[in-house]
From Swiss-Prot:
Keywords: Aminoacyl-tRNA synthetase, ATP-binding, Cytoplasm, Ligase, Nucleotide-binding, Protein biosynthesis
Stated name of the protein: Glutamate--tRNA ligase
Family: Belongs to the class-I aminoacyl-tRNA synthetase family. Glutamate--tRNA ligase type 1 subfamily.
PROSITE patterns noted in UniProt: AA_TRNA_LIGASE_I (PS00178)
Oligomeric and partner information: Monomer.
Alphabetized GO MF terms: ATP binding; glutamate-tRNA ligase activity; tRNA binding; zinc ion binding
GO cellular component: cytosol
EC number(s) reported in the record: 6.1.1.17
Catalytic activity: tRNA(Glu) + L-glutamate + ATP = L-glutamyl-tRNA(Glu) + AMP + diphosphate
GO biological process: glutamyl-tRNA aminoacylation
Organism: Streptococcus pyogenes serotype M3 (strain ATCC BAA-595 / MGAS315)
Motif window: 'KMSKS' region: 255-259
Task performed by this protein: Catalyzes the attachment of glutamate to tRNA(Glu) in a two-step reaction: glutamate is first activated by ATP to form Glu-AMP and then transferred to the acceptor end of tRNA(Glu).
Length: 481
């Protein structure tokens, strides 16, 4: 009988939720939900130097915003933070010490640095050399006594089987193996401050929580042999491992970096700019996984039903901000008006634009929005000075038929009564100008659009003119003549 599927997302509360970590959480979530398993949130907070106040809350809030839920977490279960599990780690460290599978190491940071420098100068691969090699029992006892008398606090190191082979069938990359002799020597499982290192604590946690599958980024591949060593030392069965490919910047082809200013990399950024969470969820789900076919827009329920771990990509996933914005626009275009207006409202309110026209303006620009904050620059025409024309727009307005078109359309607007001034009546007036002047197509519509709005492209022209108002529209046209 196969083990129940239990997967986890285990963030460190060291900052905001990054797109890469969000993908790790999302793939674990989809895997659990697809197979009727359990999705667990565990907080790995043993790195006290990098601990950020509110880091845990930020992680959980942003996961919830994306639409993920979980079955077990620090919110519902005790000891789901590593800082609450120190006694458990100590229990297993003591066991390994008692069995001779680990030992206390008194070498100082200065000595380690000097040895590393010597090895590099000699062209050797840096590795820890067991400080007790060649010592008799008496010499070892004397060495330890002297070090402790000098106040040196030891670390605890795992005794590595240098001839061991550590291999696994990776869910994404296939068979991977490491030789024990290439790990870098005996490695620290407990730091001087008493906290366990990541590669030790994560094994204890995964075993204790009965994790069946560990799905994470391939930057963790080098950690896996060390973790397999701990499973071996403690006599435990290891879970299955799957290492997702890196996310790269589609423009540079390099690993996505926090210095890449052409991308929004933190979930908080998408929240602040007014993206729909469903769009961000959909986009992240396709970073390194492909359901097959041409379709790219999927609901959360569809993604759960379609998710197949065998379709996780072996090639790097390209993060394309333009693709994200295209997908976001698709979601906003097809969302109900109330949803989009609720996203836009805070931005309109902050800008002092929550007027009687606010709903109409959101309706007008809804098809263009990639994020709700764009409602402000898009509606500048209605609240700010007329924009400066671009060179391309000036070129259009220099056309020989422009004056004829604008004079004729201005006359049509002036002749309209207040009662008749409605979007459905404005378009026939433009067509009437075409009939009277014989000017049509771009030569007709483009000068009117630029004269009224200062832009070559935009929403439906009659609606723009209506919301701008007859007097304002006439004023703008006069200024162009």
């Amino acid at each position: 009988m196969s083990k129940p599927i239990r997967v986890r997302y285990a963030p460190s509360p060291t900052g905001l939720l990054h797109i890469g970590n969000a993908r790790t959480a999302l793939f674990n979530y989809l895997y659990a939900r697809r197979h009727g398993g359990t999705f667990i949130i565990r907080i790995e907070d043993t790195d006290r130097k990098r601990h950020v106040e509110d880091g845990e809350r930020s992680q959980l809030e942003n996961l919830k915003w994306l639409g993920m839920d979980w079955d077990e977490s620090p919110e519902t279960h005790e000891n789901y933070r590593q800082s609450e599990r120190l006694a458990l780690y100590q229990q297993y460290i003591d066991q390994l010490l008692a069995e001779g599978k680990a030992y206390k190491s008194y070498v100082t940071e200065e000595e380690l640095a000097a040895e590393r420098e010597r090895q590099e100068a000699a062209g050797e691969t840096p590795r820890y050399i067991n400080e007790f090699i060649g010592m008799s029992a008496d010499e070892k006892a004397k060495y330890i006594a002297e070090r402790e008398a000098a106040g040196i606090v030891p670390t605890v190191r795992l005794a590595v089987n240098e001839s061991g082979i550590y291999k696994w069938a990776d869910m994404v990359k296939g068979d991977i193996e490491f030789e024990g002799g290439n790990i870098g020597g005996d490695w620290v499982i407990q730091k001087k401050d008493g906290y366990p290192t990541y590669n030790f604590a994560v094994v204890v946690d995964d075993h204790d929580m009965q994790i069946s599958h560990v799905i994470r980024g391939d930057d963790h591949i080098a950690n896996t042999p060390k973790q397999l060593m701990v499973y071996e030392a403690l006599g435990w069965e290891a879970p299955e491992f799957g290492h997702m490919t890196l996310i790269i910047n589609s423009e540079t082809g390099k690993k996505l970096s926090k210095r890449d200013t052409n991308t929004l990399q933190f979930i908080e950024d998408y929240r602040k700019k007014g993206y729909m969470p469903e769009a961000v969820f959909n986009f992240i789900a396709l970073l390194g996984w492909n359901p097959g076919g041409e379709e790219e827009i999927f609901s959360r329920e569809q993604l759960i039903a379609l998710f197949d771990e065998n379709r996780l990509s072996k090639s790097p996933a390209a993060f394309d901000q333009k693709k994200m914005d295209w997908m976001s626009n698709e979601y906003l275009k097809h969302a109900d008006f109330e949803t989009v207006y609720a996203l836009c409202k805070p931005f309109l309110e902050e800008a002092g634009r929550l007027t009687e026209k606010a709903e109409k303006l959101v309706e007008l620009y809804k098809p263009q929005l990639k994020s709700a904050d764009e409602i402000i620059p898009l509606t500048d025409l209605f609240f700010s000075d007329f924009p400066e024309l671009t060179e391309a727009e000036k070129e259009v307005m220099a056309g020989e038929t422009v004056s004829t078109v604008l004079q004729a359309f201005k006359a049509k607007l002036e002749a309209m009564s207040d009662e008749d001034f409605k979007p459905e009546n404005i378009f026939p007036q433009i067509k009437a100008v075409q009939k009277e002047t014989g000017i049509k197509g771009k030569n007709l519509f483009m000068p009117i659009r630029i004269a009224v709005s200062g832009e070559m492209h935009g929403p439906e022209l009659p609606n723009t003119i209506y919301l701008l108002g007859r007097d304002k529209s006439i004023e703008h046209i006069k200024n162009m003549l």
